[in-house]
Amino acid sequence: SYFGLRSFGVGERGGLHCFTLNGEPIFQSGLLDQGYWGKGIYTPETNRGMYDSLRQVKALGFNMLRKHIKVEPLLWYYYCDILGIIVWQDMLNGGERYKQYRINLGPFINLRLNDKNFESMGRGDPKSRAQYMAEAEGTIECLFNCVSICLWTPFNEGWGQFDSLAVCEHLRGLDTTRLYDHASGWQDMGGGDVCSRHIYFKKVRLKNDKRRVLALTEFGGYSFSDKNSGKKVFSYRNFASAQDYMKAFERLYMRQVVPAIKKDGLAAAVYTQLADVEGEINGIFTADWRCKGPAEDFCRINAALYASFDLVFKV
């Protein structure tokens, strides 16, 4: 057995809000991690492989992973604990069939739905809502002692979302030691601790929320063509070569994300995504854990994020 001592919180400076670790401001630079594995699909092939994948993340300068709508074996969280990787944990969303066009329009227009309209959000059945609450409560109970978990995300992009303000406060009553991103993406009801933005098809343009931490919780999704695969796979933007991909990746961060720290008080960024999965090749690692760019380039980009943040929140 083991234990860890740490505190997660929210700090403020000059009207801008940020995350804190043990009372000190910290920029959280992370990757969206859907938890798929090359051969095991939902299950890591080996414990060593699970550990090594996390070491690779840390070696590139990232300090956070957003575990996307999946709960991992406790060993995975232990490895994050000992390696010093912060974890944002999504709840499982679920729900019934919803009006898909309402959700799919989110990346393109600011269409905010009323999440008390349970039918339109795929939560018309009271049993479905009760099942969600039971699973969310069980997730907190199961993972409560995982030191690395900083934040819970009850809902993502409106998928099965319902009464998110009340749900968030109910879960906060079960765990007051962590922060909450009550509705990650485009169905923000103004609650929780995070103003959570997903931006894919447009330039990164943000606005200081004045009450909550401003976080870019999904963006990017770049890839480059694999002419040998013969498969049609999804990415948000595709490039002709690894060199073009890496140049675009750096431009995205240096020209859009880094400036948003000083201009808007951006305090966290979660790039989509950690590794390629079936049907999506927009990871910074391939499915067999080969990095798509030089480690020093990723480290330099992350160093620029941290330096810009320190000038705003620490100096």
Residue ranges and their predicted role:
Residues 133-134, 148-152, 206-315:
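Substrate-binding clefts and catalytic carboxylate motifs of secreted carbohydrate-active enzymes
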Residues 77-79, 100-103, 192-195, 281-282:
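Short secondary-structure transition/capping segments
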Residues 27-32, 196, 214-218:
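Active-site-proximal beta-strand elements of phosphoester/diester hydrolases
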Residues 1-100, 106-114, 118-151, 155-162, ...:
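Active-site-adjacent substrate/metal-binding segments within catalytic domains
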